Amino acid sequence: MKTAIIGYPRIGENRELKFAIEKYWKNEITENELLKIAEEIRRNQWLKQKEEKISFIPGNTFSFYDGILDTIILLNAIPKHYRDLGLNELNTYFAIARGYQGEKGDVKALSMRKWYNTNYHYMVPELDDYAKIKLNADKIFSELEEAKKLGVNTHPSVIGPFTFYKLAKTTGNKDKREYLGNIINVYIELLEKCNEKNIEWVQIEEPQLVTDQTEEDIKLFEEVYTEILKNKKDVKVLLQTYFGDVRDCYGTIIELDFDGIGLDFTEGRKTEKLIAENGFPKDKVLFAGVVNGKNIWKCDYRKVLNILNNLKGKAENIVVTTSCSLLHVPYTLRNEEKLTENILKHFSFAEEKLGELRELGELSQILSENSLEKTQENEFYIKNQEIITSKRGMEDKEVRDKVEKLTDNDFVRKGTRKERQRIQREKLNIPLLATTTIGSFPQTKEVKLNRSKFRKNEINKEEYDKNVFNFIKECVKLQEKIGLDVLVHGEYERNDMVEFFGENLAGYVFTEKAWVQSYGTRCVKPPIIFGDVKRTKPISVLYSEYAQKLTEKPVKGMLTGPVTILNWSFPREDVSLSEMAFQIGLAIREEVLDLEKAGIRIIQIDEAALREKLPLRKEDWHKEYLDWGLKAFRLCHSGVKVDTQIHTHMCYSQFEDIIKDIDNMDADVITFEASRSKLTILDFLKENNFETEVGPGVYDIHSPRVPSVEEIVTALDRMIEKIGKDKLWVNPDCGLKTRGIVETVKSLENLVKATEIVKSRL
């Protein structure tokens, strides 16, 4: 049986692309040198996929920054202010992604949002009145030729017009529908060019179809593809979906003239039922997404073969594929030298999933000609089940008992919000329009070297901590000099807001090189929840307590919340998400109470990733996620005194639809990203009478540009107009870890100056 994948990691096995792009940004390598490195990355992954006998290898899945940004280029939908910079093609591309500040102009980046329910971010397309939508497919065809020269047959893969249209926003006076005809024409022309080049298949990805669809949405989808598909000629079109099922529009999809349909059998809870009740067309190929593209556990062949066995007689032509792009998992287990084989055998990264697909392709072929029982006699199946059924260990009865004994009172905080606000203002002496940062400060070469030496056992813990304390001392001095009101210790002891806590919690295991792209060149190395989670010792208390002793101003204790730790880890598949969240919540609760005992009066519990795992179907939001997610957060802070102020922070997300739920987290202050999205959330805060004190980010830290005093004043004026001065905090939109120290200082100085100007008017 044939096999396929939807996409593949593009950062390079050892993050070669990340380092090359960052060198290019610093003018340390040329464009040609960057292109050569990119070509080598593509070469390696194509040859690996060919080696593992993948039948359908997608092209155009490589990107220098983001696939949606590549689609903006494909459609020539570049907003005018980026074109007007007069930069070359590659630098214009990066200006859209990062913003630009230089002799040719000063523009902000496009806004970023989470890619459905993943930790990946995409650039939000903006259609302005000057947009001239037309095909620009040079990248697609050059990469196809590149693969062909290697003896690898690939097919074009593109984000579909329906998804692009739904994710895009307009910034001018034109109605969005005015762009639709030209968008459709681009895809028609793309298929025509593919036909001219005798390309057999084109993969068009439409993940938007797995979200709630209205009748109007379905009508739009049908309109778009009726027009496109009648022009496909000899090209076969694969409609690829992922991240869920297509329950709202399955009937429409199977009636349209697609040649292949890719469905998710991993997260798509109703996919099997849809086929059982409605059938699957005999003239179409079913690309069955049965290998989990999001998680890192070894695939359970028993479950996969059961699905494929159930499809017998319902779908005649099946291709075994992944549930989504392998972009969301690390490259390979080959480079993991510190974990034991007893642990590693349970995992499967991108490269290993190719091997699983090869084995499943063979097993599926056997199954198509034999019974399920006969297929299960195969050596591949037997070896797989030996691993799947083997015990992992790391169970902790004490932790499980604690979770089981939790009562409603464990999730309720002392004092009403109004009482707490009054007491905290008095005790903490917090001024109006208090200025602060989100937590981390730039990770300089010295900070990274200190951590690297410690990890390599070149320095001991005492020397490591001594260096960290020096970094903290300088950070506190710097913040006092700038004039911030509420300080942070800089987080120099942690390389990642989740990995740091995971390293100090029982139940986690850690990799050396299992990097995953979050956005652009930002990569994360998610820890793996391998067993029951508990805190074995204080984690951050030492550093926060030291920082507080250096100043009279309040210093925030900095923690990561249970939902974010869970969402930014690779979770177990043998226990529920709620069970894991409560276990982590109990561990963070212990840390919160220890910080309070150490004299830390403001404690920030970041829930940067709360929104991103919200189920894609609204009917599932509370029962499948928010009901336990909000409780896990409240469990962390319900034991503190009324005069201890609890902060939380959220990163790039759409909050408008869960504003009331965020209020129900019962934090005292929330900070979040707002600058890239042009502060649109302010209206929703006002409409919903949001009670929590709030700090919408006044400038974008994901761009190297320094905000002017004037633009921060303008942002603050707008915030005060919408939500008033009494509940407003002033801060950047995220942590400063990835920024340079010079731009950080300039930006924060401008933030404080702008705040003083606004305060002088009140």
Task: Give, region by region, the residue ranges found by the protein language model.
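Domain-level signal for soluble alpha/beta catalytic cores
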Residues: M1-L762
